[in-house]
UniProtKB/Swiss-Prot annotation:
Disruption phenotype: Drastically reduces the production of andrastin A. Transmembrane segments: none annotated. Belongs to the NAD(P)-dependent epimerase/dehydratase family. Dihydroflavonol-4-reductase subfamily. This is Ketoreductase adrE. It comes from Penicillium roqueforti. Keywords: Oxidoreductase. NADP(+) binds at Y171. Its EC number is 1.1.1.-. PANTHER family: ALDEHYDE REDUCTASE II (AFU_ORTHOLOGUE AFUA_1G11360), NAD DEPENDENT EPIMERASE/DEHYDRATASE. The lineage of its organism: Eukaryota, Fungi, Dikarya, Ascomycota, Pezizomycotina.
Length: 336
C-alpha cells in the first residue's frame, strides 16, 4: 500500500469491523491486520475459533472480539466504538426470520442498526472515518444490455413498488435503504467523521476458515457437487474477488483522496459457461460439474465508477488491475 504517512488513520490504530465472522468481513479484518492495524471485531455470539485463527495468522494481541447480539438496542455499539479510530460496518442487520417479515419492517430493522452505530460513533472523537458495506443493488440492479450505473445511481424499485403494489426482495430493499439512510443521517447530523461506502457485486474467492460461510462463493462451490442453484441468478451479475473488495474497504477507510464517496467493487461481466469451463479445467475428473446453461449472455453495460476503484487498487496496493475470474475461482475452491 502507499506510504503509511499518507493514511488518514495511522498504522497501529484500532479499527472496528462489524460481523467479523462473515465472508467479506473476515477478509477486511485480515487486510487491516496485514497493514499493521489492530482490529476489534463484533460477532453476535462468542466465536473463540475466530480469535484463534487471526492470532495464528497475525500474532497475539492484534485482534479482539466483542459480542454485540442485538443491533436494535440504542446502546448496542456504545462499548465497541470506544478507543477505535475507524469503523467498517459490514454486518447486514436483517431480522432472524426474514421470510416472515414485511419489507417495511425489515428495512426499518436494517436502518436502525446503521443509525445506532453512527450515533455511537459520533460520541467518540477518535473516530475519523466510517465505511459502510453496501451492495450493487443499492445503485440499481441492471436488467439487460446497455445499462449504465454511476456514482449517483440509486435503485428506485422501492418507490416503484409503492406505486404499483409489487414487492421487492428483502435483501435488496435492506441494502437500498441501509445505504440511502446512512447518507441522509450524515447529511442531516454532520458528524465529525467522514462516511464512505463500498458496493460489491457477486463476490468470489478464498474462504479463510471452514466456519466462515462462503456467501456467494458457497453457491459457486456447489457447482462442483452438481448444484445448479447459481444458474438462477438472472440477469447475470458481474463478479469481483473478495480480496479486491476487502482492499477497497481499507482504501475507503485510509485513503485521503476518498471522501464522501461510493466505491463500486465490480470487476467484469461473465457467464456461467465461463465458470463451468474454468471449474472443469481445475477439476477435470469431476463428473458432477454440470453443463453450462444454453443461450446465456453476459450482462453488458457500464459501471462508470468501477474504473476509479480499479485505479485505486493499482495505486494503493500495486495491483495490475482487478483479480481475474480464474484466479478468484481457483482460490475459492481450494478447500473443495
Amino acid at each position: 500500500m502507499t506510504q503509511a504517512q499518507n493514511y488518514v488513520i495511522p498504522p497501529g490504530s484500532k479499527v472496528l469491523v462489524t460481523g467479523a465472522n462473515g465472508y467479506i468481513a473476515s477478509h477486511i479484518v485480515k487486510a487491516l491486520l496485514d497493514l499493521g492495524y489492530l482490529v476489534r471485531g463484533t460477532v453476535r455470539t462468542p466465536m473463540p475459533w475466530l480469535a484463534e485463527y487471526f492470532e495464528r495468522q497475525c500474532g497475539l494481541g492484534r485482534f479482539e472480539l466483542i459480542v454485540v447480539s442485538d443491533f436494535q438496542q440504542p446502546d448496542a455499539f456504545d462499548e465497541s466504538v470506544k478507543g477505535v479510530s475507524g469503523v467498517i460496518h459490514v454486518a447486514q442487520g436483517l431480522p432472524s426470520s426474514t421470510a416472515a417479515e414485511t419489507v417495511k419492517s425489515a428495512t426499518a430493522y436494517t436502518v436502525n442498526g446503521v443509525i445506532n452505530l453512527f450515533k455511537a460513533a459520533s460520541t467518540q472523537r477518535t473516530i475519523q472515518r466510517v465505511v459502510l458495506t453496501s451492495s450493487i443493488v443499492a445503485a440499481g440492479y441492471p436488467t439487460g444490455k446497455g445499462f449504465k450505473l454511476d456514482a449517483d445511481s440509486w435503485d428506485e424499485s422501492l418507490e416503484q413498488a409503492s406505486k404499483d403494489g409489487t414487492t421487492v426482495p428483502i435483501y435488496r430493499a435492506c441494502k437500498i435503504e441501509g445505504e440511502r439512510q446512512a447518507w441522509k443521517w450524515v447529511e442531516k447530523n454532520q458528524p465529525h467523521f467522514e462516511l464512505n461506502s463500498v458496493l460489491p457485486w457477486l463476490t468470489l474467492g478464498k474462504i479463510l476458515h471452514p466456519n466462515i460461510g462462503g456467501s456467494t462463493m458457497g453457491y459457486v462451490s456447489g457447482l462442483l457437487r452438481g448444484d445448479t442453484t447459481p444458474f438462477k441468478f438472472l440477469p447475470l451479475p458481474w463478479f469481483v474477488d473478495v480480496e479486491d473488495t476487502a482492499r477497497l474497504h481499507a482504501i475507503a477507510l485510509l485513503n485521503p483522496s476518498v471522501r464522501s464517496e461510493r466505491l463500486f467493487a465490480t470487476a467484469a461481466p461473465f457467464t456461467w459457461g465461463d465458470v463451468i469451463e474454468i471449474l472443469k479445467r481445475i477439476q477435470p475428473n469431476n463428473a458432477r460439474i454440470p453443463a453450462a446453461p444454453i443461450q446465456e449472455e453476459p450482462t453488458l453495460g457500464d459501471v462508470v465508477p468501477a474504473a476509479r476503484a480499479e485505479k485505486l487498487l493499482r495505486e494503493t496496493f500495486g495491483q495490475l488491475g482487478w483479480t481475474p475470474l480464474e484466479v478468484s475461482l481457483e482460490s475459492g475452491i481450494a478447500r473443495e
